[in-house]
Amino acid sequence: MVAQIGPRKPRHTRSASNAADAVAIMDATHTERAIIIGFSRGVQRGLLLAAHQERVQAAVFIAPSYPGGGKVPQRIAFEWGDELDSYEGWAKYNKHYWLRDHRGFLEFFFSQVFIEPHSTKPIEDCVGWGLETTGETLALTHLAPEMQPEEAREMARRVRCPVLVIHGEADAIQSASRGIALAEHTGGQLILLDGSGHAPHVRDPVRVNLLLRDFIKPAPPPRRWARGRSRRKRALYISSPIGLGHARRDVAIADELRKLHPDLEIDWLAQHPVTRVLQAASERIHPASAYLANESSHIESESAEHDLHCFQAIRRMDEILLANFMVLHDLVRDEPYDLWIGDEAWELDYYLHENPEQKRAPYVWLTDFVGWLPMPDGGDHEAFLTADYNAEMIEHIARFPRVRDHAIFVGNDSDIVPDAFGPELPLIRDWTREHYSFAGYVTGFDPADFADQGRLRHEVGYRDHEQVCIVTVGGSGVGGHLLRRVVEAFPEAKRRIPALRMVVVTGPRIDPGTFAEHEGLEVRGFIPELYRHLAACDLAVVQGGLTTCMELTATRRPFLYVPLRHHFEQNFHVRHRLDQYGAGRMLDFDLATPDAIANMITQEIGRSVDYKAVESDGATNTATLIAELL
């Protein structure tokens, strides 16, 4: 068991009571011994707990608030209880300022906790948590008696268990000298992190996780080893689980890659709903996939009625991405691969650039969009945040160009939006041309195979006299509101189009049984080869995901697409690309009443279209680029 010792709800108390509480918890949970981890002032509680030698197996102290290591210079220039003429910098660490401007103090304090560039997310989180209490309550916590230096040193010298001290050298809250002193006084191991601030477990979590693991439970050496020349040629493929579009194109790329390297074995690190596509294609899903935290569930939890703030949802997925990177780390540590392929595998790309020493194989990055873009109603703050994320990515690539051995854009340069990454940042199209190879779009099929519409309709079960409308929202569970809106429109559309047959495809994460029944309307779940049904339809109503829209564009079918509100990729990147092809008709969900949808279906069904042709060799081109690394 690992017990984390940290600050509790504020009250007038000594650290001893916190340590006693921890012992009581161990007793209640029948935990004989524990490894304790203390952060900042929680280290003082940890020292008290470590005095119970029979209960503490080992202790880890991160950025310790350890009085035995001297004072923190920048924090002793002002007295906490004095009224001051002005409150700038550390003068804000003051009772009167806390009572006057609690938010102002939090914003300053956490800007000092997270001194690392591009720390907007943890600062935002911590300020939000801090606002759950008040300046008055915070001031009360400061009245508790402080641990004195000699008392702290005495406790440290009594510690008999193994100790690891982790401290950022740039810590602006607790000087690194305190961590150095604590390691010396406990006889513990000291790890100093250059450039890290007060919370390295937040800003350098991979490094801290690995330090914890090596200290607590070092990995045993592998029992078997194979000489390089006797190893099978292997690739690890990570496909984005947000929707199903990535999975379909990735299977097509994998098929082409095997044609170029017939001896190549491909393992997939994947989660639902991607696993449904992989299972249908008889691909090998690595058993480690069972340990992945599900990203689609998070995305669904972030959505409202046809509304998904995609940028913020991914920002708030940070703990999931970290957990999944650690799964990947353990997998590639134990099993050698000749190649890693990540199709919008954000966890892999971000944490590799943050920890380039963890790269163990050539790595290919695939994406169909470049650049986070702000939604108009997000104002200046959202524009600042997206620019900050873009700047971090640009800096990653500039500092560590060797991390991505290939960066492949799934499309052409004209598909890239003309916007800039942000103020004083380059144009997205210009930067992408310099840093990516272009493979063309990957459909996973040849549109020429569907030239005989009559035969195709017969194969998928549609009769010649029917006017077939397919309604689908991809592989996530976010699109349920659009499906229900279209189902509401069906009776009126059917009245206007007597031959109408509507097929609502819910995908693997929406229950088909939750929809109303009508004659001429059928509701189906996951369809493995949905693109064939789309190619055979007379009209499709879809959400706005790139894959489905491009499948319809490639097969020249008329379609209505309804982008999710606040989904920057669907509203900007996908819409721009479809405009290049002259494809689809965009419909605003706010205006898409059942009557409006019925009217649009009546206008669009069976309409002849003249889209720009979509290339059919994208998968081959992509595989050829990847094969260069094998």
Language-model region placement:
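A nucleotide-sugar donor-handling region in carbohydrate enzymes
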Residues: 373-377, 381-477, 507-509
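Flexible "cap/lid" loop of the alpha/beta hydrolase fold
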Residues: 51, 59-96, 561
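Donor-nucleotide binding loops and adjacent catalytic segments primarily
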Residues: 422, 440-539, 590
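Conserved nucleotide-sugar phosphate-binding/catalytic loop shared by glycosyltransferases and other
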Residues: 260, 264-315
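Active-site loop/oxyanion-hole signature of alpha/beta-hydrolase fold enzymes
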Residues: 1-41, 210
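Conserved alpha/beta-hydrolase catalytic His-Asp/Glu region
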Residues: 88-150, 155
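Short beta-strand/loop motif that positions the catalytic acidic residue
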Residues: 159, 165-167
